[in-house]
A protein has these predicted regions:
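Compact alpha-helical subdomains of small soluble proteins
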Residues: 32-39, 43-79, 114-171
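Short amphipathic N-terminal alpha-helix
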Residues: 105-115
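Generic structural signal for well-ordered, non-membrane alpha-helices
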Residues: 21-28, 46, 75, 91, ...
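N-terminal acidic leader/helix
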Residues: 96-107
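Short, charged, low-complexity loops and linkers
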Residues: 2-6, 75-80
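Short amphipathic alpha-helical segments that mediate assembly, nucleic-acid/protein binding
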Residues: 16, 20, 41-44, 90-94, ...
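N-terminal leader regions
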Residues: 1-42
Length: 171
């Protein structure tokens, strides 16, 4: 698959430690001094936006301990967003869908081992789900990846079925 479609793990790897450090430092600051007026939050948001190039409004630096942890939040902030790829192919779409449906492979690389699942999971914010939402806007739905009753049987759609639905009206 072309590099412009693949998640940019190398960029994420380069930014990850600095972003994680900012998140944990903010937590320590809040534990010691509080941040009732949100002034420190806004400062950290600005620093993270500068590091990542992302709109930080979709991330919560306050509640990471109730969500998936500081490490996952740091990765999500560090990973560059998917882009619109107007000349995507059906084969590339099939590769994406197959990755999303496949078990997570094992990696010798600790960074990939820890975070690869975050790009393939079919949920809001996951890289490939967001790529599909962006590039197949007319046909994408998270429900394509959920179990459903089909002809009286509870099952998931196959990769081919999902590809045909998504490709049907190219986004």
């Amino acid at each position: 698959m072309r590099a412009q479609i693949e998640p940019d793990f190398e960029s994420a790897r380069k930014k990850y430690d600095e972003i994680l450090e900012q998140i944990l430092a903010y937590t320590d600051y809040c534990d010691e001094f509080g941040d009732e007026d949100g002034e420190e939050y806004r400062k950290v948001e600005q620093r993270l936006a500068k590091i990542s190039g992302k709109d930080m409004s979709k991330f919560s630096l306050h509640e990471w301990w109730e969500a998936e942890g500081a490490e996952n939040l740091a990765f999500d902030i560090a990973l560059p967003e998917p882009k619109v790829v107007p000349d995507r192919t059906k084969d590339e779409l099939r590769q994406i869908v197959e990755r999303m449906l496949a078990p997570v492979p094992e990696f010798d690389d600790d960074f990939l081992e820890a975070f690869y699942v975050r790009v393939t999971f079919a949920c809001k914010g996951a890289y490939f789900a967001e790529f599909l939402k962006l590039n197949f806007a007319q046909t994408f739905s998270f429900e394509l990846f959920e179990r459903r009753e089909i002809e009286g049987v509870m099952r998931e759609l196959s990769a081919n079925e999902i590809v045909e639905i998504l490709w049907g009206k190219r986004g």
